[in-house]
């Protein structure tokens, strides 16, 4: 179920404060955050935000298409190593 329009998008206050400081100082360094639950706002466009995936921070450059999505959607937490297959079938390809 989606969030009520009357409530507005959720963004952690500390992340908004960091964005305001970076915009004011015209700083190009990535903003480091653990807040995967925060919604991307139009104010974030053009910034690089490093989102924690549980192990490391993944740098994400924010574009217009990302507005309205959550930061965690762009920082995957699981590594896909491929499906298990039959070892005999994989070796006998011609």
From Swiss-Prot:
Keywords: Ribonucleoprotein, Ribosomal protein, RNA-binding, rRNA-binding. Pfam families: Ribosomal_S19. GO terms for molecular function: rRNA binding; structural constituent of ribosome. It comes from the Bacteria. InterPro entries: Ribosomal_uS19 (IPR002222), Ribosomal_uS19_bac-type (IPR005732), Ribosomal_uS19_CS (IPR020934), Ribosomal_uS19_SF (IPR023575). PROSITE patterns: RIBOSOMAL_S19. GO terms for cellular component: cytoplasm; small ribosomal subunit. GO terms for biological process: ribosomal small subunit assembly; translation. SUPFAM superfamilies: Ribosomal protein S19 (SSF54570). The keyword NADP does not apply. Belongs to the universal ribosomal protein uS19 family. Protein S19 forms a complex with S13 that binds strongly to the 16S ribosomal RNA. This is Small ribosomal subunit protein uS19. The gene is rpsS.
């Amino acid at each position: 179920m989606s969030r009520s329009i009357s409530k507005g998008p959720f963004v952690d206050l500390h992340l908004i404060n960091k964005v305001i400081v970076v915009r004011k100082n015209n700083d190009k360094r990535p903003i480091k955050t653990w807040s995967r639950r925060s919604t991307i706002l139009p104010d974030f466009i053009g910034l690089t935000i490093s989102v924690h995936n549980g192990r490391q921070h993944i740098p994400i450059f924010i574009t217009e298409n990302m507005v309205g999505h959550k930061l965690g959607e762009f920082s995957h937490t699981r590594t896909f190593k491929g499906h298990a297959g039959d070892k005999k079938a994989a070796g006998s390809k011609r």
